[in-house]
Each structure stands twice: as structure tokens, then as C-alpha cells.
Amino acid sequence: MSVRLSHLRITASAGTGKTFRLTDRIVELLLLGVEPRKILALTFTRKAAGEFLRKLMEKLASGAEKEGEAGKFFERRMNSAKESGLEELARHYAAKVRRPEAEQQMEFRKALRKVTDDLDRLEMGTLDSFLFRMVRGFAPELGLNREVRVLDEAAEEREESEVLGDLAAMLGSDAKVREQLQRDLIGGEKGLAPADPLRAEVRELQEAERIWYEEPGAVWGGEREIFPKGQPEAGKVQEPAWTELPAGWEDFSDSVLEMANAGPGTELSGKARKLLENIVGLEAGRAEFVFNRKSGVLSGDPARYAGSVARGYVQRLVAWRLGRTRRLGEYAQRLAQVRKVRRSRAGMLRFADLPQIAQDEVVQVPGLAYRLDGWFDHWLLDEFQDTSRSQWAALEPLVEEIWQDSEGRRTIFYVGDVKQAIYGWRGGDAGLFTDIAKGYEGRLKDEQLGRSYRSGEKVLKAVRHVFQPEALQIAELDRKVVAGWKQGWTGHVSDETNERKGHVEIRSAEGEDIWKTVAELVKEARVLEKGGTVGVLTRTNDFAYEGAEVLSQEGLRVTVEGKRSVVTEGPLGPACLLAGRLAVDPSDRLAAGGLRAGMLAKSVAEGIEPFAFRSLADFGSGGAEGMVRGWLSSADISGDTFLEDLAEAVVRAGRAFDRSGGRSVREFHRFFAEYQDPGATLRGAIQLMTIHKAKGLEFDLTIVVLERGSGRSLRLDSTKGPHLRSGETPAGRWVMELPSQEVCDAVPELAAEMDRVRQEAVLANLCLHYVAMTRARQALVLVLPPVKDAKGRGKKKSEEESDGEA
């Protein structure tokens, strides 16, 4: 490389052209003589990786052929070098700018030829695919089969259920041990089983496993590490006579007795929770609060006794959580052993396994790490705010060599936006955006992109009005949250092509009116008829699918980009599941009766045995896809958009099963029962999806639906548990699953940790809503629940009269 480049960190707000800037960097490297095979560009989705390659080829072709494009590139890079203080690079590009256009274009032609000749060695892909390449490249050294492959999501769900079985077997045949495992994973403090126990068990274990890998050496449920100064102790006070209670507090002693008998799994009444809320004052001997809607003061021994009972309750729940955390740590350790055995035997990996294997078994092994070090000289990392600690741990030893380069011959370039860090729930850590450069600040240049090329000026004005730090201060958000948000705020300026453009409005609706309102908006705007795009964003897949059904009934074409179990959809999904059951067991009368009464009744018109025989024959000749196409040929779905889309989903299920290597109809029946369909985009259709799924996309009309209900809160600081946390005290690193808010508030160390949970929740929700609002190109509509007036709020059930739980 003829001149030096700097390491570069770019902070890019939504719609400001980070892909453009990243491909500029790749073109720059190519024009400076870097071989394509020495460049590594990583992002998080295959779609984004494909976009990189497409934009790169377009940029090289334009520079090679279009008048003035090569000169514009050199001038752009010259100005950027000047702004960054890179004088040598600025002089280099100034000389390029002065050269004849024919010579400028020739440089681009040479770079384009170099890329096309070496296209198969150009590494532009996802972070997961790169980690997989690392693992597969050293499979023999890792004790893995060379045919190692990554499970797709449907196959991974089957794998996880089998892993649970292996884990239970490893823990022993004792029924009590198995019952304890189940209680730990799905019972929790509330004693309430989730709607889908298996999926809940898997999620709980996966979170424990992730932290177990990220926190090596931490003590799980270590009381000494978490509470180095010890926990507050319950006072030794005899029960008083309760003769001098405030007026209207006659049943206060009943609430004290309730708490004395309560423990993990107990649902506390609102009255009993008053003891927790006022525990500090009660323990001190004086507390003033409202009980039975009567304000009063409790003092002396009655107060101290109530405080000691509340403290005893807190101690019981903390002890239970510590024990449960210790068991979760043991499960995570045993789970790692189970996975190692299974992957060495079958060569099947999850995406979540890749960072751990790459870190522990590849980059930490000197011989293997040395072989990796020479792979790439220039690293370009996209969407860096979504990188997890475990992923970075796998890359860091390799990138460390890049940081050490003082000659400018090897570089790191990373881009991100901490305002769009919406994947913390799966391990993404926005703090890495600044942390990884600590110690190398002198070698790193910073660049900010704040000019939006996506959104109309009026849309950006709304974004600023809601999200700029001053607005958050006016809204009285936690000052620590505002300070953290301010660090990542880069502002938003509209490009001149979007000045005075855009439309923003708010519509109020809740319940059944939400989707009627959305349908009206789409029909009024007529964006689809004009060839534009419409995105409707929700917070959950379930709500998106609910909307898809209603909007389809309104005559609108809809596709859902989230994932949903096909077998629960409309009348067709369950009918296909019954068909699979009958193909497996023709003697199943219940399945036969259900099939005759449903959408696939014509398929069994000639009898059950002919149907089963035909299904097996179709499976033998065309796999699961051929079999389900045979079933669907008997269904009358023509003209019904919803059913046509659902039929396509059923076919995708068959195709996915065939690709997973499944070999029998019985296996397909199990597979189909658990299959989560990724959906498909339809031209001229409303694209319904979760906000998470919309990341990286843009729509001419964006409708954001924020709904209440079903456990969903519109509060920014909503902290739905459980929270498995890690930290450090002078006594060492620890891991603990936090108890409920009320219990945490009674213990200083846990109160501080729960406060951090709340701050993280606020930041995560700010990021989520920022992503939602910045998807809009021309029009943004927010559909929100009506604001309840004071009179409406007064009708709500009082906190004392409601049930609570700690």
C-alpha cells in the first residue's frame, strides 16, 4: 500500500449512508493496491452483506465508465483526509484529482478487474459465517467432523429439546433431581408455568449458558462475593399485642402474618406489600404510610416487629434466588459438556456455539492463531453496536495484531450507532463501541455521519423533537440515561433533496380499532398503488400476525416478516398437521375426523388408506415439499390472499425439512409441529414485522403501532424479569438472578443492581423506538393508545386491593 491509512471509527445515525461510507473504504483500499483477499468486511445479516457487494461493484463500475464519477470519489476522499488531519493521504488524493479523467477511470477499471478475478476470495459476509469458516477450517484439530454444519432454526429447536433430555439424564435418574430442574427452569419465584414450558426452559438455559461462557471464574450465587459486607439481618423483636394501631388499620396484623408465612412462589396481597415498601422505616422504629386507604404512623415495637418479619421474608427470597442461581450455574456447566459430546459425535453446531468454539479452541491456541493472523490485513466491521462480548472475544486476539500495526499497512474500520443498539437481549453490548479502542485512542480517527439521505425533513424534525438529549431532560428521564444517550447522539440534518418533505401524524386507537385504523391509513395514502412501500411495525410477532389476519380480511395484501408457528394459522395450518398425523398413523380416528371436517376434506374423499399411501408415495418421490403440495392441491384457496400466503408457508416448511436432512414422514410431522416460518416479501403488500426485524430497512410509509395489554407496558423503564446479572465486588466476580423489584429495593447491593437494570431498560426502549421512527422515508404515522384522563385513572383498582407478588 503506497500511503498510510488510519484506523477509523464511524458513528452513523440512521439513514446517513454508512453502507456508502463502508464501500468507499473498500474502494479506497483497492485503489491503493490492497489485494481483495486481504480485505474482510463483516455485518450481521446476509442481506446486508449482499448489499455491500452490490454497492461495491456498482461503485467500481460507475468510476470506470460514468463521466465524472472517478473524480468525485477522489475529491470526496481528499476532503475526508483533510478533515481527519491525514496530510499525506490528502496530498495523494489531491494529485489524483488533478489527473485526466481517462487515467482516473483506468484505475477503477483495474480495481474492478482485480475484484472480479478474485471474487470467490473476497470476504464479505456475516460475522456468523466468518466464525463458522474459522471453526470449519480447523475442524480436524478441534475433533470435529469435516462435514460440520450449522443447524437452521427449526432443526435447532429439535436439537434443544434433545439437549434438555441429555442434560436431565446426566443429572441422574433421581425423579427429585429432574423435578428440581423443571422447577428451576419454568417455575420461578412465582410458581407459574409459562404457556410454552419447553421454549421457556430452553430460553432460560441459553441465557445461563451465555453468561457462563462470558463470565469464566465468576461465582454463581456466591453470597460472599455479592454481599461482601453481609446482608441486613432481621431484628429480634417479640410480636406486640397490636392494640395501638392507627385508625382503620385493624387488619394490619393479618398482613404481617401473611408475610411471615410467605416464601418463594407465594403471591402477596397489596396490603402485605406495604411492609416491603416501608421496610427501612419499620426497622428503624417509625414509618408513615397509607394502609387500607388510611394514612397513619406505626412506631415502636409494632413497627420494628413488622420490619423484622419483612426482613425475614426478604432473606428467604434472596436465599432462594442464590440457591437457584447456583443450580443454574451447574446446569450451564453440565450443558456445555452435553453440547461438546453431541457436536463431536454429529458435527452439528448452533450459531451460538461458534463464538465460544472460535475463542476457546481456535484463537487461544498459539499454532492455530498464528495461521489465522495472516488471513486479513484490513478489517471492516458493520453494525458494531450489536456485537456481543462473546463474539468480540473470538475476534479480539486477531484484531489486536491490527491495532499494533504502527505503519498504517493494516487497519481496522468499524461503524455503528449506539442509538440503534436493540439486540441487548441476545447479548449485544453497545459499550464495546468505545471499549475496544481503549489504549489506542492516539491511533484512531473518529468520524460522524449526521446528514440523512433517507427521511424527509419533517420526519427528522419529529425524530429530533422526541429523541434529542434536551427533549429527554424535559421528559425527566434518569440523568444517567440522558448522559449515556448524549454520548451517542450525532444529530440529524436533512439532505437538501429532502428539504420541506415528509409527513408525520399521530392516531389514537386501541383494541379492535387499531387494525381498522391501520387499514384506513393504508387505503387513504394509496402508497402501494403508486409503487411505494408500506411497513407496519409492532413490538411482538403475535400482534403482527393478529394484524395480518385483520388486514387480509380488509382486502389488503400482507406479508409478515417475523416468524410464527404455521400449524396455528387459520384453518389451513391445523389441517396440514392433521394430514401429517394421518399419514403417519392411518388408524388415528381423531385425526381422520378432523381432516374430513376441515379444509383438506377432499384429500380423504377416496378413503384414509389411499390418502396415506398417496402421501407416502409423494414423500418418496418429492420429499416433504412434494407431499404437502399434494395435500394443498385438494384445498380451495384460490383468491384468498391470506390462505394463499399460508399455503406458501406450508410449502416452505416442507422445503426446510428436506434441506435439514429429514428422512421420514414421522420426523416431518414432529418438525412441522414446531416449524417457525420466516415469511416472504410480496410486491405490492404491506410488510408487517416487529421493530427488531425492521432494523436496516426503510419504507415510504411507516406505521408504528404501540399497543397496551397482554403484559406489555408502554413505560420506558418496564423491567420484566427474570434478570440474570453479573458483577464484581472486592471479593470477586459474581452471577445472580435478581429477585423482584420490591425485594431488591430492601437490599442495598441488589437495589443498585436493579437500578442499573432499569437504566438499561430505558436505553433499550429508547433505541427500539428510535429505530422504529427512523425507518420512514416520506411519511411516519404513530398509532398510540388514547391518553387516559385523571378521571379514568381514578377508576383503576387501588394498589392495596390488587394482588402482588415479590
Residue ranges and their predicted role:
Residues 714-756:
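Conserved catalytic motifs of ABC-family nucleotide-binding domains
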Residues 604-624, 680-687, 692, 741-805:
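C-terminal accessory regions
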Residues 1-54, 58, 152-154, 162, ...:
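Conserved motor-region signature of P-loop NTPase helicases/translocases
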Residues 1-10, 43, 60-270, 349, ...:
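Conserved ATP-dependent motor core of P-loop NTPases, especially the RecA-like helicase ATPase domain
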Residues 13, 38, 68, 190-348, ...:
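Conserved ATP-driven helicase/translocase motor core recognized via long
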Residues 124-131, 156-160, 164, 249-252, ...:
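Conserved helicase/translocase P-loop NTPase motor core
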Residues 190, 195, 686, 694-731, ...:
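Long, charged, helix-prone linker segments
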